[in-house]
Amino acid sequence: MAQVKIDWEEFKNNIRYFYNNRKQCEVYIKTVDAAVDTEEKQKRFYEEFGDMCDKISVERVIPIWTGYDEIYKDFDIDKKNGLHGDRIRRVECCPFPFYSFVINPDGQATVCCSDWERKTVVGDANIQSVKEIWNGKQYRNFLMGMLKNGRTQNHEACRVCAYPCYDAVDDIDPYRQKILEKYKNVTREKETL
C-alpha cells in the first residue's frame, strides 16, 4: 500500500525489540482495512503482530483527509458508514476542538489532526504554554465561530473536512446556542479581570 521496500523481518524485529523494552509505553499496532482486505490477510496481520503489542486492530479507512479521493482511488471504500461502522451523519458543529487540539512538530498549535495544511493555527508552543493556547483569544474566537456559524461557515479547513461526519462520538449541535452563551460569559469575565 505504501509502496516502500523494507526488510520485513528486520521491521518486525524492531517492533518486537521496542515492545520488549517499552517500560511504561503502550504499544498499539494498527492497520487499515484497505491494506488487509480479506479475512486471510487480516488473520495473517493478527498472527504476525499480535504477540508484540498491547493492542492491535484493523481500522476502517474513512474519507476525511484533503486529497483522499486521489490517494484511495484504487480502493473500494465504504463512504456510507463511519469509523466505527455507524451511519455517517451531517455534523454542523465539530466537537473535536472543544476537547483537544494538536501541537505540530514545529510547535504550531492547530485545532485538529485533520488540518495537515495548518490553516487553523491558534497558538505556538514555542512561546506559549498549553494552558495559554487553550485559554487564548485565538482559540476562543475559533470555538465561538464554530458555535455561531457551524463548521462549514467557520473556516476553510473545516468546510472541506469530513472527519466529524465519520467519527464524531459527541453531538453538540443541539447545544450550540447554550455553549455559545457560556463562552460569551467566560469571555466577559476574562476581559474584566
Regions found by a protein language model. Name each.
Residues 8, 90-92:
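Nucleotide-sugar-dependent
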Residues 100:
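Short hydrophobic/aromatic beta-strand element in the GNAT-like acyltransferase core
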Residues 1-59:
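Radical SAM/AdoMet-radical enzyme domain recognition
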Residues 103-104:
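Short, acidic, Ser/Thr-enriched surface-loop or helix-capping motifs
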Residues 108-109, 114-193:
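Flexible mid-to-C-terminal extensions adjoining Fe-S/redox cofactors in radical SAM and related proteins
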Residues 35-37, 57-78, 116:
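Flexible glycine/acidic-rich beta-alpha junction loops that bind and position SAM and/or redox cofactors
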